[in-house]
C-alpha cells in the first residue's frame, strides 16, 4: 500500500498542474495553445483518476481513465485534421 502522505502530495501536485493548465487555457494566445492546454487537462484528469484508483483500490476507475484518455486522443486527432484543412488558428 502506498503511504497516505505520498498520495496527498501527488493529489496536490496534480491539482496545481490542473490550475496552471486552466490559466493557460484562458490566456491563450492562439487556438492551438488552448487545445494543447485542454489536452493537458484531460491527461492530468486521467492521472488523478489513476491515483484515486490506487488510493481506493477500486480497479473500475482505471476503465474510466482509459475511456477518457481515448476520448482526448480522438479529440486531438480531430483538431489536427481541422487545422490541416485550413481552419482558423487565431495567430
Question: In which residue ranges do the predicted regions lie?
Answer:
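Flexible extramembrane loops and terminal tails that flank transmembrane helices
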Residues: 1-27, 31, 36, 49-62, ...
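Hydrophobic alpha-helical transmembrane segments of multipass integral membrane proteins
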Residues: 12-22, 41-44, 70-73
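Alpha-helical membrane-embedding segments
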Residues: 64-79
Amino acid at each position: 500500500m502506498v503511504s497516505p502522505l505520498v498520495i496527498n502530495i501527488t493529489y496536490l501536485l496534480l491539482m496545481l498542474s490542473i490550475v496552471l493548465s486552466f490559466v493557460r487555457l484562458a490566456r491563450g494566445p492562439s487556438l492551438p495553445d488552448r487545445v494543447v492546454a485542454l489536452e493537458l487537462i484531460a491527461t492530468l484528469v486521467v492521472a488523478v483518476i489513476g491515483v484515486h484508483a490506487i488510493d481506493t483500490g477500486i480497479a473500475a476507475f482505471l476503465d474510466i481513465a482509459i475511456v477518457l484518455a481515448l476520448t482526448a486522443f480522438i479529440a486531438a486527432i480531430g483538431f489536427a485534421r481541422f487545422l490541416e484543412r485550413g481552419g482558423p488558428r487565431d495567430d
